[in-house]
């Protein structure tokens, strides 16, 4: 039986692989429970239905998404993964590279809260958009 830290690290790796790399939208229902909250910058998504709004909007703008976990640290009830992602911007066809950090918090082995910060300004620069625009304004 894996210990708590190993189970949390395995969950994080599976999250990136199933949800993002394999585009298994149904994995969100399996892995992101109703009580879970994602904090993405100033936005907040509660439960799988709200998370899917974020996911679908992002996937509509990006194809060929590939997330590569670079480093993962597990301590107590939290896991932090530094990652790099590649994707193709659907409207322009430009290849993008984005880096970020995701922090996951667990209770009783279940994901309950997540925070992610990613280089939105770097993505906008790759799209050659003014930094004053948000990603959703530039990509839409």
Q: Model regions: which residues?
A:
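Generic short beta-strand segments
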Residues: 35, 82-88
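Short, cysteine-centered beta-strand-loop-beta hairpins and adjacent loop/turn segments enriched
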Residues: 60, 64, 86-97
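Hydrophobic/aromatic beta-strand elements that line small-molecule binding cavities or substrate pockets
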Residues: 55, 67-73, 85, 99-104, ...
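Short, low-complexity N-terminal intrinsically disordered segments enriched in polar/charged residues
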Residues: 1-30, 34, 130-140
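A solvent-exposed, acidic/Ser-Thr-rich amphipathic alpha-helical stretch
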Residues: 5-7, 25-77
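Low-complexity, intrinsically disordered terminal/linker segments enriched in charged
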Residues: 113-140
């Amino acid at each position: 039986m894996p210990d708590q830290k190993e189970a949390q690290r395995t969950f994080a790796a599976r999250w990136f692989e199933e949800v993002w790399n394999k585009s298994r939208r149904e994995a969100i229902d399996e892995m992101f429970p109703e009580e879970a909250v994602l904090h993405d910058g100033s936005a907040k998504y509660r439960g799988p239905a709200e998370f899917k709004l974020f996911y679908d909007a992002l996937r509509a703008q990006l194809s060929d998404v590939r997330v590569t976990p670079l480093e993962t640290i597990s301590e107590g009830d939290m896991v932090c993964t530094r990652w790099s992602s590649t994707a193709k911007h659907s409207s322009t066809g430009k290849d993008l590279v984005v880096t970020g950090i995701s922090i996951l918090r667990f209770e009783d082995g279940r994901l309950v809260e997540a925070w992610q910060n990613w280089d939105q300004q770097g993505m906008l620069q790759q799209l050659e958009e003014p930094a004053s625009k948000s990603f959703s304004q530039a990509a839409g």
